[in-house]
């Protein structure tokens, strides 16, 4: 959650944490889904991708390499939306370096 905030990526919902039936209708509003643990949520992400065309990131951000890959995949998806929304593309390389340099 902190990394997403640092990168300027707004969070629609965190399921199942704090999730309720009232807010499930808002799931399709997300630009993409994050599945940090494949054991929990992967089937939902696959369903949402098939039904609504919502891509997902399923890399567990543990360790230097996987954290860098996780952020790089999010950068790709955010930049895909940037072109649709006429916004400037993002570059998370400096964030990746900062997060992995002193480990």
UniProtKB/Swiss-Prot annotation:
GO terms for cellular component: chloroplast. It is found in: Plastid, Chloroplast. Pfam families: Oxidored_nitro (PF00148). It catalyses: chlorophyllide a + oxidized 2[4Fe-4S]-[ferredoxin] + 2 ADP + 2 phosphate = protochlorophyllide a + reduced 2[4Fe-4S]-[ferredoxin] + 2 ATP + 2 H2O. One of its GO terms (biological process) is photosynthesis. GO terms for molecular function: 4 iron, 4 sulfur cluster binding; ATP binding; metal ion binding; oxidoreductase activity. Keywords: 4Fe-4S, ATP-binding, Chlorophyll biosynthesis, Chloroplast, Iron, Iron-sulfur, Metal-binding, Nucleotide-binding, Oxidoreductase, Photosynthesis, Plastid. Its cofactor is [4Fe-4S] cluster. Its EC number is 1.3.7.7. Binds 1 [4Fe-4S] cluster per heterodimer. The cluster is bound at the heterodimer interface by residues from both subunits. Pathway: Porphyrin-containing compound metabolism; chlorophyll biosynthesis (light-independent). Transmembrane segments: none annotated. Gene3D superfamilies: Nitrogenase molybdenum iron protein domain. Protochlorophyllide reductase is composed of three subunits; ChlL, ChlN and ChlB. Forms a heterotetramer of two ChlB and two ChlN subunits. Belongs to the ChlB/BchB/BchZ family. Component of the dark-operative protochlorophyllide reductase (DPOR) that uses Mg-ATP and reduced ferredoxin to reduce ring D of protochlorophyllide (Pchlide) to form chlorophyllide a (Chlide). This reaction is light-independent. The NB-protein (ChlN-ChlB) is the catalytic component of the complex. This is Light-independent protochlorophyllide reductase subunit B. It comes from Cibotium schiedei (Mexican tree fern). The lineage of its organism: Eukaryota, Viridiplantae, Streptophyta, Embryophyta, Tracheophyta. The gene is chlB.
């Amino acid at each position: 959650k902190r990394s997403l905030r640092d990168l300027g990526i707004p969070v629609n919902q965190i399921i199942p944490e704090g999730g309720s039936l009232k807010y499930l209708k808002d799931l399709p509003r997300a630009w993409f889904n994050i599945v940090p643990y494949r054991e929990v949520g992967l089937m939902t992400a696959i369903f949402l991708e098939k039904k609504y065309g919502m891509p997902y990131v399923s890399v567990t951000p543990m360790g230097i390499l996987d954290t860098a890959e996780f952020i790089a995949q999010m950068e790709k998806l955010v930049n895909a939306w940037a072109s649709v929304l006429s916004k400037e593309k993002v570059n998370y390389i400096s964030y990746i370096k900062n997060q992995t340099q002193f480990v």
